[in-house]
C-alpha cells in the first residue's frame, strides 16, 4: 500500500462509518487499491480532473459510497421480483458513462453479489475498468466500450453519475432496463427542471437526499422506473410492460 493510501485509510474508514456502511477490511482495502489505481492511470489517461488524493477520496470515493446503502436497500427488495433480470439469480447493474469507474467499481466492491457492467464510449476508460477488475480481483465487474443505446438488457439497475440530463439518460438507456428495473441517477442539486422534462416512458418515484462526509455540496439520487404500460421501442422501454 502506498504512503498516500496509508494516509487515506483512516478518513475512508470514518467516512464509510458516517454513511452507515459496514464494510469489511477486504472491501476497505479494495477501495484504497482502486483509488491508487485511479491515481496511477490518471497520470497518463486523464480519467478525472481531480488530481489531489484527498479530493479524490472525498469528491469521488465517498461521493460514490453515499449511494451504496440506498442501492443495497433497493437490491434487497428486487432479488425475487418477477420480471427482474435477477428473478432468483444474480442481479445486474449497468453503470452508464462510468468514466473512471465511479460509481460502478465502488458498487462492484461493496455489492459482490451484484453483476456490474460499466459502459463508456471512450476506449481507454473501458480498458481502465477491465484493468481494475483484474487488479482488484472483481469477477463481478466488466468494462464495455460501446454506446449505451446499442446495449440490450435486461439490467435491474441502470445508474449514472454526472453523466447527462435525466431525459437523455432515460432515452439512451431505455432498451437496457428490465421491466421491473430502476434508474439510479446521481445528481447535485434537486434537478426539478430535468424531472419535468422526462419522457413519458419513465416516472420518478423518489428523490433521495445524500450527505457526503467532508463534502459541502448538495447531492441526491433521482430514482425512476419504467412507467406502467410503457411500450418497447422509440417511445417505450425494452422488455415486457409492467403488469
UniProtKB/Swiss-Prot annotation:
Keywords for the protein's UniProt record, in alphabetical order: Cytoplasm, Methyltransferase, rRNA processing, S-adenosyl-L-methionine, Transferase
Subcellular location: Cytoplasm
SUPFAM superfamilies: S-adenosyl-L-methionine-dependent methyltransferases (SSF53335)
InterPro entries found in the cross-reference section: rRNA_ssu_MeTfrase_G, SAM-dependent_MTases_sf
EC number: 2.1.1.170
Family statement: Belongs to the methyltransferase superfamily. RNA methyltransferase RsmG family.
Function: Specifically methylates the N7 position of guanine in position 527 of 16S rRNA.
Protein name as it appears in the record: Ribosomal RNA small subunit methyltransferase G
Lineage: Bacteria, Pseudomonadati, Pseudomonadota, Betaproteobacteria, Burkholderiales
